[in-house]
């Protein structure tokens, strides 16, 4: 006769049935859960942060990158994205965009932009609108607060900084300190129409806010009153010059088309140079080509996209990136400028821009479309290329969103 089970024996055996990983943890015949939630399979994976460029698979689990290697079985994942013949990168990081009710973070996300910084649309007086967009966005959105308290809205012909009463350091600092989770730095536009003769004072005031807090100044250059070397002298390591390939006056080239020595010196001491494509006075083929031929490639590429720019000279971030294939940069160089380098430019993004194991699972998949493609600069000069990046799939925090 079998021995009678005591209550203690019964409780112990019942507990064993509930232990994870035991043979009885799932009903007989039920298939095991897949090892990975999602697999991006068979694409050319370009991860500049890891110096990785090869055909491989990207496996995702729990919203994080779990493995990057060739030959991962499709049966090991719940969902598979077939990326054969396509380019797989970390999610794009666009550090200069202008959001509003029309150009939403969701619109940018559909083009592969999984993180973005609004470049000064909002100042201290209307920062709540930008904060709302950042709070409600699925992708990661941070703000570069305009030193001009009304941002790009409401001042009309006065401009953000033409009247320094609009550049109140105390007011801007309070807005930054109240929203440190979402404000990544200060934006200043230094062109004559926005700052006039106040451009140098604007840099000084912006630095008064950012330097004690370890934040970034992004300065829009081109067509300024003051010479660029005087502006650069006031910028600190980690600060960003945007519109690096803006035409004269007061761009990065001298009258003979040679790179100013002060520009190289600024880079050597840690100032970053960003593209900021935009629509007017920010990027010309001539300046970009001359600078790149002299070895002065951008540190980061950004779109400076606005709602009107979606149909005029900018179009979307992948189109901006594709222009630099035409200008002679390699695809890995371009991807670096829009992922790892862009993420490192702003502390709020430094865990992004990579497919390293454990990183947030933000992934973009592109078709590198071959054929005649027309690209246009800010002067509406058309050049023809042969390759264009076209979004094919986007993964945000491990979930496919395109």
Regions inferred by a protein language model and the residue ranges of each:
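Divalent-metal coordination cores built from histidine and acidic residues
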Residues: 107-190
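C-terminal cap of metal-dependent C-N hydrolases
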Residues: 43, 360-402
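Histidine-rich, glycine-flanked metal-binding segment
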Residues: 26-28, 32-39, 45-90
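Divalent metal-coordination and catalytic microenvironments
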Residues: 43, 63, 85, 112, ...
């Amino acid at each position: 006769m079998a021995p009678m089970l005591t209550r203690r024996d019964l409780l112990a055996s019942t507990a064993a049935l509930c232990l994870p990983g035991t043979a009885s943890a799932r009903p007989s015949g039920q298939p095991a859960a897949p090892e990975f939630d999602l697999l991006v399979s068979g694409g050319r994976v370009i991860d500049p942060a890891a110096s990785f460029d090869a055909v491989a698979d990207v496996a995702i689990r729990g919203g994080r990158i779990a493995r990057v290697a060739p030959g991962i079985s499709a049966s090991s994942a719940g969902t598979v994205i077939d990326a054969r013949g396509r380019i797989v990168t970390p999610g794009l990081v666009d550090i200069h965009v202008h959001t509003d009710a029309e150009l939403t973070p969701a619109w940018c996300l559909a083009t592969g932009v999984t993180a973005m910084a609004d470049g000064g649309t909002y100042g201290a007086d209307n920062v709540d609108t930008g904060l709302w967009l950042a709070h409600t966005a699925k992708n990661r959105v941070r703000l570069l607060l305009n030193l001009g308290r009304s941002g790009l809205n409401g001042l009309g012909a006065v401009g953000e900084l033409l009247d320094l009463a609009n550049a109140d350091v105390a007011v801007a600092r309070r807005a930054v300190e109240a929203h440190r989770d979402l404000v990544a730095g200060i934006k200043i536009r230094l062109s004559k129409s926005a700052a006039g003769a106040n451009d140098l004072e604007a840099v000084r005031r912006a630095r008064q806010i950012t330097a004690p807090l370890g934040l970034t100044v992004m300065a829009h250059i081109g067509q300024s009153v003051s010479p660029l070397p005087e502006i650069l002298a006031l910028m600190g390591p980690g600060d960003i010059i945007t519109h690096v390939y803006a035409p004269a006056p007061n761009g990065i080239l001298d009258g003979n088309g040679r790179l100013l020595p002060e520009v190289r010196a600024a880079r050597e001491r840690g100032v970053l140079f960003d593209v900021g494509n935009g629509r007017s006075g920010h990027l010309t083929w001539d300046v970009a080509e001359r600078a790149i031929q002299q070895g002065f490639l951008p540190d980061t590429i950004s779109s400076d996209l606005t709602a009107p720019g979606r149909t005029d000279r900018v179009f979307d971030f992948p189109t901006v990136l594709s222009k630099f294939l035409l200008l002679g940069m390699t695809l890995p160089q371009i991807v670096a400028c829009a992922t790892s380098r862009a993420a490192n430019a702003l502390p709020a993004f430094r865990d992004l821009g990579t497919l390293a194991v454990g990183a947030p699972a933000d992934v973009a998949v592109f078709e590198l479309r071959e054929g005649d493609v027309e690209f246009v600069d800010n002067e509406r000069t058309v050049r023809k290329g042969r390759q264009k990046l076209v979004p094919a799939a986007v993964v945000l925090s491990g979930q496919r969103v395109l």
